[in-house]
């Protein structure tokens, strides 16, 4: 009985000490080299705007584009005609040609104002050819522009929510030309890790070789795994369908903190840890106030001149911050709680995290985008 109880306790302890390893499919970890989208771009016109289009006197290319388009439709605009248009806007149209895109397939397009149009809401994009980097037309775009923002103005005041100078057309372009593909022509396929990691490259290679494809996968560097595959399109499709569903134990990921310097957003993964440190955060504010004073001569008919003299006041205020202790934190919840205790704004938190990394208190890679 004692021996049975001992083994029961030992088995329980071993179960508690073994942390479950997280597994992810290979399709979530890698991209297939050569299977990617291609950028398309075009220039076009959006019409039907409710007086919110380009100011043609300031954007002459809009008038020129409209004249050329009307000429192609058989309508001649007399030379020297000054067209005061308010319902037309010049736009740039972008899209992505998906991998293995076929003629007749629809893709989404993004429409962005090129001139000084106030809003593209309610506009219609006229037929616009979309070209690739080789200057060949691969798709044609046309349709009603969907704008996510909203705005109104009256009496010199205006209110705007989100962006009005850009929109999207769902399935707004039709593929007219297909890209040549070499898929299936070679018996080797290159898998590229989304994040370079030597250990992950080895794990992916070992997982493929253990799943009935022994000797087919070889890691070449920290990002690329070479896989031997059967020849032919249909054979490689079946092969990749099996390989992409193989699970890999990813283990512990690199601790990383990502900071967006434009918006002040701070994002960190679950592996970020902190060491104990003391932080003092102070704010320095400079206020400049300038007023224009009018100086007039004392005698009305003395021949003097009225002058404007600026008066400037500058004040500097510094809000001192006391040292605050930040305890060491071993998990993400404690890290968030410790950073929130500082009471810092996101922009201040960016500077604090940089200083903590320099002091060796932030155990993570700091990436600023």
Curated annotation (Swiss-Prot):
GO terms, biological process: bacterial-type flagellum-dependent cell motility
Assigned GO CC terms: bacterial-type flagellum basal body, distal rod, P ring; outer membrane-bounded periplasmic space
Name of a matching Pfam family: FlgI
Sections of the chain in a coiled coil: none
Keyword Flavoprotein: no
Keywords: Bacterial flagellum, Periplasm, Signal
Family, as annotated: Belongs to the FlgI family.
PANTHER family registered for this protein in UniProt: FLAGELLAR P-RING PERIPLASMIC PROTEIN FLGI (PTHR30381), FLAGELLAR P-RING PROTEIN (PTHR30381:SF0)
Name of the protein in its database record: Flagellar P-ring protein
Organism: Pectobacterium carotovorum subsp. carotovorum (strain PC1)
Species lineage: Bacteria, Pseudomonadati, Pseudomonadota, Gammaproteobacteria, Enterobacterales
Protein encoded by which gene: flgI
């Amino acid at each position: 009985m004692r021996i049975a109880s001992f083994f029961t306790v030992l088995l329980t302890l071993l179960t508690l000490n073994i942390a479950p390893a997280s597994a992810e499919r290979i399709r979530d970890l890698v991209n297939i080299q050569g299977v990617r989208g291609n950028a398309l771009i075009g220039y076009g016109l959006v019409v039907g705007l409710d007086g919110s289009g380009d100011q043609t006197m300031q954007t002459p290319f809009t008038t020129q584009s409209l004249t050329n388009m009307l000429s192609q439709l058989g309508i001649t605009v007399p030379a020297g005609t000054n067209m005061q248009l308010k319902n037309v806007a010049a736009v740039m149209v972008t899209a992505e040609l998906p991998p293995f895109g076929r003629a007749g397939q629809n893709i989404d397009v993004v429409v962005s104002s090129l001139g000084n149009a106030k809003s593209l809401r309610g506009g219609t994009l006229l037929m616009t050819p979309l070209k690739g980097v080789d200057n060949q037309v691969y798709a044609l775009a046309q349709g009603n522009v969907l704008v996510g923002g909203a705005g109104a103005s009256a009496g010199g005041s205006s209110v705007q929510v989100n962006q009005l100078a850009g929109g999207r057309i769902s399935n707004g372009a039709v593929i007219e030309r297909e890209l040549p593909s070499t898929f299936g022509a070679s018996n080797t396929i290159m898998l590229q890790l989304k994040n370079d990691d030597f250990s992950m490259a080895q794990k992916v290679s070992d997982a493929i070789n253990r799943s009935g494809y022994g000797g087919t996968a070889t890691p070449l560097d920290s990002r690329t795994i070479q896989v031997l595959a059967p020849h032919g399109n249909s054979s490689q499709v079946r092969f990749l369908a099996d390989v992409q569903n193989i699970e890999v134990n990813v283990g512990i990921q690199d601790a990383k903190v990502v900071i967006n310097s434009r918006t002040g957003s701070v994002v960190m993964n679950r592996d970020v840890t902190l060491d104990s440190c003391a932080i003092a955060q102070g704010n320095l504010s400079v206020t400049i106030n300038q007023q224009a004073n009018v100086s007039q001569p004392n005698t009305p008919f003395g021949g003097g001149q009225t002058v404007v003299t600026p008066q400037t006041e500058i004040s500097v205020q510094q809000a001192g911050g006391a040292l605050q202790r930040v305890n060491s934190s071993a998990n993400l919840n404690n890290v968030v709680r410790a950073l929130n205790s500082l009471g810092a704004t996101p922009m201040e938190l960016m500077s604090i995290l940089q200083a903590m990394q320099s002091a060796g208190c932030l155990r993570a890679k700091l990436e600023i985008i």
